[in-house]
Structure formats: C-alpha cells, structure tokens
C-alpha cells in the first residue's frame, strides 16, 4: 500500500496509465504543474502491469517527493460483476474506481462500502446518473463521485453543455447530501493535465465555489487514501472485521 505520508496539498486523483514510460511522463508533468501526488489508474484487467510499473516509478529519484497511489478501474456489466471485481482487488489497490453510466451499477457502487469512487456516473446518459436515493447511499457509505474534467475539455458544443449541466446537478446533490466529490483530470497524455488553479477556475463554470473545488483536490483525496486501507474490513453498516492479531 501507499506510504503513510499523506500531508500533501494538491492531488490529481485520476491519471490514466498505459505503460511505464507514458505513466512516468504524466507523473513528472503533474509534479511540474504543482501537484504533490496522483493516483495512477489502470483497468482491472491490467493490474499486473500496474503493479510492476508502480514499483519502478516509486523508485524513480525524480518522483521521490511525489506520492503515487495505485488505482484500479472496474468496468462492470452488472452489479454482480462489480461486486466480484471489487472483492478481487480491494486488498490489492489503494483506490477502487467503478466506471459509471449503467444505473444498476451506479446504485451498486453507491451502496458498497468497499468502493472508493464512482467515476462519471452520467456516462452515455442524459441525466446525471445519480438521484436523491443514490446520493444518500453514497454519503452513507462514503463513496466519492468523480467529475473528470476531460469530459468537459474534450467535448464540444451540445455535448459540453450537457456535461456541464450534469456536473451542476451532481454538485447540487453533493451540497444537499454531503457525499465526497472529486475533481480530476483523467489525463491520458501530458496535454490533458491542468494546474490546480486552472481546474478550480474551470469548476466555476458549473457553479463550484473556490473552497469546494480546493477541497475536492486536497482534503477529499487525502481522506479517501487514509480510509482506503480499512475498506476491506467493512462488510455492513456498523460491522467491521477485526484484523488478525
């Protein structure tokens, strides 16, 4: 698991890794832009690559002051598939992401205490992908909702307007129910990365206050990383497995 040094300021909580060299370029650029850490996210089927790449990256002297967490993205076809994958990777990854869009999967993710992040629940939808019921469950289970700004930066006209409106609706639910909210780059190349200041300015386009945007880049990521090590012990509300002595 990640080193116990989570006293960072800005964290890009979703950097898409493909291989060692491209991941290195992304992490170095994120550091240059003012981040003190990032989550390197690989698809679940490529976890062995993530494990080997991360070991090498953490030993790179240019990244010694940059915290790197290990994230796994689960693309599930149904809730059963999601739960099976979450159980498989919960002890292996620092952060478990569930790719959103399918309403049943969105709900299962919000109801699971073993999921860290529901990513882009609005994907391929005209609605935000979560409602009052799911927002309440996400808050109860401390499941964060990710708003990747790549969906705004990489879209045009009507699509961009729709995504911004979906962000606004999710922000309203966040303010009402209090589930964790993340702003990320979801960068797959160095040209997708933005400075923390740029991200906070962009967040104003869908009504985020500067304090809310800063929290989504700082204290919320730190809290998720701090809690993730105990997620595998949570099996039901109020029920926690005791670690072996």
Curated annotation (Swiss-Prot):
Keyword Nuclease: yes
Main location: cytoplasm
Top-rank EC class of the record's enzyme: hydrolase
Keywords recorded for this protein, A-Z: Cytoplasm, Endonuclease, Hydrolase, Nuclease, tRNA processing
Enzyme Commission number, as recorded: 3.1.26.5
GO biological process, one term: tRNA 5'-leader removal
Chain segments annotated as transmembrane: none
Coiled-coil regions listed in the entry: none
SUPFAM superfamilies listed in its UniProt record: PHP domain-like
NCBIfam families assigned to the protein according to its UniProt record, in alphabetical order: RNaseP3Mthb
Function: Part of ribonuclease P, a protein complex that generates mature tRNA molecules by cleaving their 5'-ends.
Official protein name in the record: Ribonuclease P protein component 3
């Amino acid at each position: 698991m990640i080193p116990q040094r989570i006293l960072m300021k800005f964290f890009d909580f979703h950097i898409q890794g493909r291989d060692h060299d491209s991941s290195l370029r992304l992490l170095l650029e994120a550091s240059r832009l003012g981040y003190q850490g990032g989550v390197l996210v690989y698809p679940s089927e490529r976890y062995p690559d993530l494990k080997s790449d991360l070991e090498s990256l953490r030993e790179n002297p240019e990244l010694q002051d940059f915290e790197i967490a290990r994230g796994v993205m689960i693309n599930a076809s149904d809730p059963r598939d999601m739960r099976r994958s979450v159980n498989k990777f919960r002890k292996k990854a620092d952060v478990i992401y569930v790719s959103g869009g399918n309403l049943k999967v969105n709900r299962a993710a919000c109801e699971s205490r073993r999921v860290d992040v529901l990513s882009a629940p609005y994907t391929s939808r005209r609605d935000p992908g979560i409602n009052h019921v799911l927002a309440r469950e996400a808050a109860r289970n401390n499941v964060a909702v990710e708003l990747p700004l790549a969906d705004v930066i990489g879209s045009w006209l009507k699509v961009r307007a729709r995504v911004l409106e979906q962000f606004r609706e999710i922000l309203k639910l966040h303010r009402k129910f209090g589930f964790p909210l993340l702003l990320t780059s979801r960068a797959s190349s160095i040209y997708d990365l933005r400075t923390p200041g740029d991200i906070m300015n962009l967040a104003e386009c869908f009504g985020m206050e500067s304090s809310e945007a800063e929290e989504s880049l700082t204290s919320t990521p730190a809290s998720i990383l701090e809690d993730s090590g105990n997620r595998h012990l949570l099996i039901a509300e109020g029920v926690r497995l005791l670690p072996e002595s």
